[in-house]
Structures are given as C-alpha cells and as structure tokens.
C-alpha cells in the first residue's frame, strides 16, 4: 500500500508543483488504484509514473474548486484509449455537482467513453460511511472551507491471521485438506490420535491501516475525527507559521495548524501538501521543520513522491 502524490501545489500549476491530485495504490490488496482529486495536468503527471489509468477504479473528489477537478474530463477521456478488453467501470465520489460537471464536459466535447461511470454525490446531510467493500470502508465528513468540502477516512478491515505452515509440517500434519481446515480455524485429529488446535498455528489478526486524506480546510474538529489514530494523515499546508489570519480568511490551514491536528488526533504520520507557490526551496524545508516542533513525524511532500504505508 502506497500513496503517490501527483500534484502538491495550491491554486494553480507552478514550475515545481502541479495542482491537487494523489493516488492510493492498493495493488497488493485489491489490485486497484484510488485517486483523490484530479486537478489540471494530472494525466500528464501520470505519464511520469507506473500508474495504469485502467487500474484507477475509484475517484474521490474533495470539493469543486478548479484546482481539484479541472483535470477530470481529460483523464476520463484518456482512460478510454485502451483495448476494449481492458475497459473497467469507474466510481466517482464527490459533492453534489460533480456529475453535472463531468457529463457537461464530456457531452460538449463530443467525448464517448467505452466504460460506465457510477456517480455518488453527497451533501452535508448524506455524509458518514459512504462506501464499504469486503476489505475497505470509507468515511467522509464536511470540512471548513469556502465552499462545501469533504475529508476522507479510508479504513482497511483487519487482516486474517496467517497459517504457520512450517510448524504444521513439523507437527506431522500432511499437506492437503487438513491444512485447509486448520487455516479455516478448525481443530483436526491426526491418524495417531493427536489433536491439532487450529489457533496454535494461526497468527493473531493484523490491524488494518487507516489513511486520512483531507481537502482544503481551516483548522476544524472534523479533521481530528477523521484522522483519529490514522497511520497516515494527508493535510493541506497552504500557508506557513505566522500566517494563521490569512489562512483563515481564505479557508486554508498553516503547517503548524496541520501539525496540531495530527497531534490531537494521535496520528502516526503527517504528510503536508497543497503548498502555496510562494514557498520554494528552503522555505519548504523550513515549513517542515517548524511543523516538527509540534508533531515530529512530519514530512512535506513533493510532486511524484511515493510514500509507503
């Protein structure tokens, strides 16, 4: 499981940073890639990675500001340029209006897609658990921005314990159906009368990962709830230390506020993104260092950077 950042800038494309988009790679878990936001130029950024557009099965949009959605019609169209047998349906989750935005762009440009898009639109009254599969659950809450904006909490369900096959062999259990029974938690009796207790050969379930990905926001308690105990918190850092007033007026956060959210939520790791173009080079290093005074496990990410979870 990895996060790869396709765009880490704020507002408009800059030389060092494209606008907002990231992907959560779940290839080992479910052979899928989930995209969060799709600012303009996202498909160009993808060309610099190993990401296959057909693997992108779900797109989560945080809000309707252009730097988070203007790349969506182009990406969806480019995704169509694949062999027919590789076409897979796509789910798009986002605020009310995302369907109209996408379909208007596709219709007026004469674009035809060889796959279906399933839209899931939300307003403030329909948030909470927005998606569940056998391996993942996704929750959403309203953040505090200048327009309706959501943050997402992706929860991996606990992983089953693994079978200690070597220990079973040493215990004299023949490979075959008995292995399967033990793996399923059944006790078995061998021909010599010995009983094999399944739980002695299966490790404890492994806690699933929690990944919190926030859209643009002022400092808000909703961010804390979404990030509670998260393995990774991705939080915007449009402004730096001392910029709290201007951040609030524009519906954004500073690096220090993001760090405080991570600390209050007892998150394990904080990744800062959505950085204003006025911060470059050493300024970015300083933003990270300042945030570390509040939350030590902080990192300010760069475009195309990949982070393991």
UniProtKB/Swiss-Prot annotation:
HAMAP family: RNase_Z_BN
SUPFAM superfamilies named among the record's database cross-references: Metallo-hydrolase/oxidoreductase (SSF56281)
Binding site for Zn(2+) 1: 63, 65, 145, 216
Sites where the protein binds Zn(2+) 2: 67-68, 216, 274
Catalytic function, reaction form: Endonucleolytic cleavage of RNA, removing extra 3' nucleotides from tRNA precursor, generating 3' termini of tRNAs. A 3'-hydroxy group is left at the tRNA terminus and a 5'-phosphoryl group is left at the trailer molecule
Top EC class, one word: hydrolase
GO molecular function: 3'-tRNA processing endoribonuclease activity; zinc ion binding
Family per similarity comment: Belongs to the RNase Z family.
EC number, UniProt record: 3.1.26.11
Xref: Pfam families: Lactamase_B
Subunit structure: Homodimer.
Cofactor(s) needed by this chain: Zn(2+)
Protein name per the record: Ribonuclease Z
Function recorded in the entry: Zinc phosphodiesterase, which displays some tRNA 3'-processing endonuclease activity. Probably involved in tRNA maturation, by removing a 3'-trailer from precursor tRNA.
Naturally occurring in which organism (per UniProt): Streptococcus agalactiae serotype Ia (strain ATCC 27591 / A909 / CDC SS700)
UniProt xrefs under Gene3D superfamilies: Ribonuclease Z/Hydroxyacylglutathione hydrolase-like
Coiled coil (UniProt feature): none
Top-level taxonomy: Bacteria, Bacillati, Bacillota, Bacilli, Lactobacillales
Superkingdom to which the source organism belongs: Bacteria
Active site residues per record: 67
């Amino acid at each position: 499981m990895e996060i790869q950042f396709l765009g880490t800038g704020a507002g408009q494309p800059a030389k060092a940073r494209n606008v907002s988009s990231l992907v959560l790679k779940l290839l080992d878990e479910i052979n899928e890639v989930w995209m969060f936001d799709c600012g303009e130029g996202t498909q160009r950024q993808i060309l610099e990675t190993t990401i296959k557009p057909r693997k992108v099965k779900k797109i989560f949009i945080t809000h309707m500001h252009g730097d988070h959605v203007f790349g969506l019609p182009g990406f969806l169209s480019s995704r169509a340029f694949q062999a027919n047998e590789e076409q897979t349906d796509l789910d798009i989750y986002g605020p009310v209006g995302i369907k109209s935005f996408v379909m208007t762009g596709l219709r007026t440009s004469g674009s035809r897609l060889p796959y279906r898009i399933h839209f899931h639109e939300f307003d403030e009254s329909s948030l909470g658990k927005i998606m569940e599969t056998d391996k993942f659950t996704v929750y959403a809450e309203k953040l505090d921005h200048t327009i309706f904006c959501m943050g997402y909490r992706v929860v991996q369900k606990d992983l089953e314990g693994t079978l200690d096959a070597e220990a079973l062999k040493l215990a004299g259990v023949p490979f075959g159906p008995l292995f399967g029974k033990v793996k399923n938690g059944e006790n078995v009796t061998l021909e010599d009368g010995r009983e094999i207790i399944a739980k002695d050969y299966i490790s404890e379930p492994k806690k699933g990962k929690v990944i919190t990905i926030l859209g643009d926001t002022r400092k808000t308690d909703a961010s804390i709830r979404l990030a509670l105990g998260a393995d990774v918190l991705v939080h915007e850092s449009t402004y730096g230390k001392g910029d709290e007033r201007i951040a609030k007026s524009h519906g954004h956060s500073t690096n220090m506020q993001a760090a405080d959210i991570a600390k209050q939520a007892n998150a394990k790791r904080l990744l800062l993104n959505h950085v204003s173009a006025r911060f470059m080079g050493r300024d970015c290093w300083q933003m990270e260092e300042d945030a570390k005074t509040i939350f030590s496990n902080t990192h300010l990410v760069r475009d195309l950077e990949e982070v393991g979870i």
